[in-house]
Amino acid sequence: MIFQKLKVYLQPIFEILRWNKPTGRIILLIPACWSLWLTPNDQPDYQIVFKIIIGGLFVSGLGCIANDIWDKDIDKKVLRTRNRPLASDKIDIKFAFSLLFLLLFLSFLITLSLPEKGRYLSLFLAFLALPWILIYPSSKRWFKFPQLILSICWGFAVLI
């Protein structure tokens, strides 16, 4: 009974983060994790691997929320997207923005928790990545090759 209620509450959140569709997350995380194993040192510390995976999930979720905020009205009219949580009013816009800012804050904390040696560079790169992440969804309207912007966003995961 309690799990059923919890599922009803969490389902739209997982959907807006696209955590119910892991393909995009895997495509993002594989290069980021490869970069950890390609460093000249020994195997990476598993705490760092964990932080990169969690940070990647948070940032990709943040990007998906930004996409749904940008496209809310369009998504309602498209068969493939009309059941997304914002388009179908399962989640309201205030909650979506709150979740976006929560993920942004948690991602910032994860970046601050990275080893001191590369922390400030990672933080700098994270701040450089943020505008790209937030404008990518709108780029489908004004840029002929929005996938280029998406690849820049995902490339930051390797650099960080």
Each model region followed by its residue ranges:
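Alpha-helical transmembrane segments in multi-pass membrane proteins
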Residues: 31, 35, 51, 55-59, ...
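Structural signal for membrane-spanning alpha-helices in multi-pass inner-membrane proteins
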Residues: 32-39, 107-115, 133-137, 157-160
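Membrane-interfacial loop-to-helix junctions in multi-pass inner-membrane proteins
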Residues: 41-54, 90-97, 144
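Transmembrane helix-loop junctions in multipass membrane proteins, especially transporters and channels
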Residues: 40-44, 72, 112-120, 138-145
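Interhelical loop and helix-boundary elements at the membrane-water interface
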Residues: 2-27, 73-99, 134-152
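Functional transmembrane core segments of multi-pass inner-membrane proteins
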Residues: 37-51, 121-129, 133, 148-160
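Multi-pass membrane catalytic core of lipid/isoprenoid biosynthesis enzymes
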Residues: 54, 72-126
